């Protein structure tokens, strides 16, 4: 099963989550592509059966605007039939950006299998939840 983990990370926190998710997907037998959004192509999303997208909270509880937002907007129509999980880290407020992102997915006909947030750098518990997210994607 082809899986892509595509993420943007400014501090390394969301990247740590992406690495953990990708590692577990690979362990479970997925043919995995792990790529930062700056290097990602539309085909990375199009060719995957399973997709995990990661972006931390930015600004006023929003997705990163220079790379991640344009990429996400460009793939919305082609990921409607994918198994999708979304994830990211935050350092202030309460993680509202994830609820906004889930709602945006729903409004665009995109089903989210799981959504995961981690406060600051993911600790052991957050990394375990990353592995659980990968397991949910593989089911």
Regions picked out by a protein language model, each given a short descriptive name:
Residues 1-4:
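Extreme N-terminal starter segment of soluble prokaryotic enzymes
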Residues 6-8, 87:
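Short hydrophobic segments within beta-strands
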Residues 13-16, 20-37, 44-139:
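FMN-binding flavodoxin-like domain, especially the glycine-rich phosphate-binding loop
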């Amino acid at each position: 099963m082809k899986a892509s983990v595509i993420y943007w990370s400014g501090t390394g926190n969301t990247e740590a989550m992406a690495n953990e998710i990708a590692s577990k997907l690979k362990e479970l037998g997925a043919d995995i592509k792990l790529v930062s959004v700056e290097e990602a192509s539309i085909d990375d999303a199009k060719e995957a059966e399973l997709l995990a997208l990661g972006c931390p909270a930015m600004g006023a509880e929003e997705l990163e605007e220079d790379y991640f937002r344009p990429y996400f907007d460009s793939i919305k129509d082609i990921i409607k039939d994918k198994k999708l999980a979304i994830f990211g880290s935050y350092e202030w407020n309460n993680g509202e950006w994830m609820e906004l992102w889930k709602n945006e997915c729903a409004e665009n006909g995109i089903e989210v299998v799981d959504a995961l947030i981690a406060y600051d750098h993911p600790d052991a518990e957050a990394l375990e939840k990353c592995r659980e997210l990968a397991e949910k994607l593989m089911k």
